[in-house]
Amino acid sequence: MTKGRKIIKVVIIGEKSVGKTSILRRYVDKRFVTLKPTIGVDFVMVSENMVTLQLWDTSGQERFRSLEISYYRGADYCILVFDVTNEKTLYDLKLWRDDFIEKTEIRDPILFPFIILGNKIDDPNRVVTEKAAIQWCKDNIGGNLTYFDTSAKDNINIEQVFKHISNQCENQPQSNEIPPEQLISLTEKKSNQSSCC
């Protein structure tokens, strides 16, 4: 039996203005644009191999915190983003992680896959080094972590982040697989022949 396509829900969280939406847009649209802050929640789906990623982006603003429970529910991965030019945004990741765990009621937070992105590495005013960020995350967040230095502006490691998720998910059993018989090929040409009985 052929395996179906897996749907993986990925939420992207962190303080406002750390580049969450720019990361998402760089990956999905393959371009960088300076954006206004996200209002509420943004959602896109992209396919990688036999995995479809549902990417959920939120504003990072306090007034939208009531949306988080429905936004977080059913997440398979959580991407925590901070700005390498603003040390406080790194320290706030623990609060974001703890809030995510509390609202999703994850059974085993140590095993849940968190991906940490140190964004804006293109900025010459970087204050958080990769080594310092990794060590801080190990000491304060712990668990199943993967770290990437990224730049949405210069397209550094953006593709690699989502390829990593896709590759990790390809061989894992998933309860939300789409059976192959329900997949529709958009590239297959149908025959124009008709038959009569």
From Swiss-Prot:
Q: What SUPFAM superfamilies does the database record attribute to this sequence?
A: P-loop containing nucleoside triphosphate hydrolases
Question: A Pfam family for this UniProt protein?
Answer: Ras
The answer to whether keyword Nucleotide-binding applies is: yes
A GO biological process of this protein is:
phagosome-lysosome fusion
Q: Where is the lipid attached (S-geranylgeranyl cysteine)?
A: C196, C197
User: Cystine bridges: which residues?
Assistant: none
State where GTP binds.
Answer: 14-21, 33-38, 57-61, 119-122, 152-153
Positions of short motif Effector region: 31-39
- Name any one GO molecular function: GTPase activity
> Could you tell me the keywords of this UniProt record?
GTP-binding, Lipoprotein, Nucleotide-binding, Prenylation, Protein transport, Transport
> Per the record, GO CC terms?
late endosome; lysosome; phagocytic vesicle
Role summary: Protein transport. Probably involved in vesicular traffic.
The protein's name in its UniProt record: Ras-related protein Rab-7B
Q: Which gene encodes it?
A: rab7B
